């Protein structure tokens, strides 16, 4: 279904696909008696394949615009997403829209449920930071003709609008800066390799290390689920029995602050003992210690451009996808210094 053709998949679509009557399909989907298991399974399979979603709202799908946009992100407690959500909501209100905000906790099943909830609320469009562990949620959006824009993450092989920052450049700048300070043993804490921003930041960091002739120890490239508990556990284990390192590149400010807290618990000072560089520059919008050296990208621009792009998609319907990649740069503050001699 073309983007912007906001038409829900109906029972008649399942009937056309399976050859069963609408009445039989309705009974199967409602798990009523009088339907063979084979027929029920065939109908359920077809319904899933074409993206059918039972509408939970009384009276069915409303016609016209609801003036509502769903914002779906991985972690609404993450300061980065809190900032972007706030900006998106403000921008939507300027255009007469209200927002519904949902979090996925990086779980694809929760992303799919959030999409189903958005469709059942008859939203006009979706701003989505995808988990990238599954395409099921995005497939539902496409099958139901729901306009959407990806924020902060992208799929290389997906025909969809997105607004991201130059993650590869940001990773390069972080690695280049630490290498120029003299660091050779750098711990890298990534998110999952399935996340485009994480993969691209690591690619840029690798490029910087290659240019400086610094070998990357695989034992110093770790994956975090971005939770405080996980980051603390990783630092605890490394300091007790892991390889030595003099600096840390964390793939988000959120992880960086948790890492600094863990280092301080072990009596290590930042940057006196260990240097730390983050990514996001949350402190461009919030003021709290420590002043973190980090990679900045324009969060306000990413948020406002995502809203503008989505509203344009809603108004104009099917067009070629728009891909926006915004610049990133290093912000030097107080958490990185040359390694101790």
Regions found by a protein language model. Name each.
Residues 17, 22-27, 61-77, 177, ...:
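Short beta-strand segments enriched in small/hydrophobic residues
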Residues 42, 79-94, 170-174, 196-215, ...:
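Short, solvent-exposed amphipathic alpha-helices that sit
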Residues 37, 41, 50-125, 203-206, ...:
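Amphipathic helical "hinge" segments at domain boundaries
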Residues 1-67, 340:
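N-terminal helix-turn-helix DNA-binding module of bacterial transcription factors
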Residues 98, 106, 129-173, 194, ...:
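Flexible loop/hinge segments that line or gate small-molecule binding clefts
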Residues 172-214, 219, 322-336:
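An alpha-beta-alpha
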Residues 163-188, 203-207, 228-236, 256, ...:
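Hydrophobic alpha-helical segments within soluble ligand-binding/sensing domains
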Residues 232-341:
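Flexible loop/turn connectors
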């Amino acid at each position: 279904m073309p983007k912007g053709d906001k038409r829900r998949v109906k029972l008649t679509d399942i009937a056309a696909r399976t050859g069963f009557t609408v009445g039989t399909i309705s009974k199967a989907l409602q798990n009523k008696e009088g339907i063979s298991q084979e027929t029920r399974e065939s109908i359920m399979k077809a319904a899933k394949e074409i993206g059918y979603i039972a509408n939970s709202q009384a009276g069915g799908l409303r016609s016209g615009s609801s003036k509502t946009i769903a914002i779906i992100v991985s972690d609404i407690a993450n300061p980065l997403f809190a900032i972007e959500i706030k900006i998106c909501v403000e921008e939507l209100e300027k255009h007469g829209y209200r927002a519904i905000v949902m979090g996925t906790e990086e779980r694809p099943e929760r992303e799919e449920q959030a999409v189903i909830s958005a469709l059942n609320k008859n939203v006009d469009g979706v701003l989505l930071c995808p988990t990238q562990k599954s395409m099921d949620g995005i497939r539902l959006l496409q099958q139901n003709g729901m306009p959407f824009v990806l924020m902060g993450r992208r799929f290389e092989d997906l025909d969809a609008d997105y607004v991201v920052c130059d993650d590869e450049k940001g990773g390069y700048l972080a690695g280049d800066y630490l290498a120029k300070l003299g660091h050779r043993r750098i711990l890298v804490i990534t998110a999952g390799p399935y996340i485009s921003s994480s993969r691209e930041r690591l690619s840029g960091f690798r490029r910087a290390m290659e240019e400086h002739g610094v070998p990357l120890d695989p034992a110093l490239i770790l994956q975090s689920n971005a939770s405080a508990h996980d980051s603390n556990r990783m630092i605890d284990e490394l300091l007790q029995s892991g390889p030595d390192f003099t600096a840390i590149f964390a793939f988000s400010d959120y992880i960086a602050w948790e890492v600094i807290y863990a280092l301080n618990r072990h009596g290590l000072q930042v940057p006196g003992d260990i240097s730390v560089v983050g990514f996001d520059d949350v402190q461009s919008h919030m003021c709290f210690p420590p002043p973190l050296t980090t990679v900045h990208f324009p969060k306000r621009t990413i948020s406002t451009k995502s809203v503008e792009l989505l509203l344009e998609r809603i108004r104009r319907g099917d067009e070629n996808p728009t891909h926006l990649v915004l610049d990133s740069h290093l912000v030097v503050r107080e958490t990185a210094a040359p390694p101790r001699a």
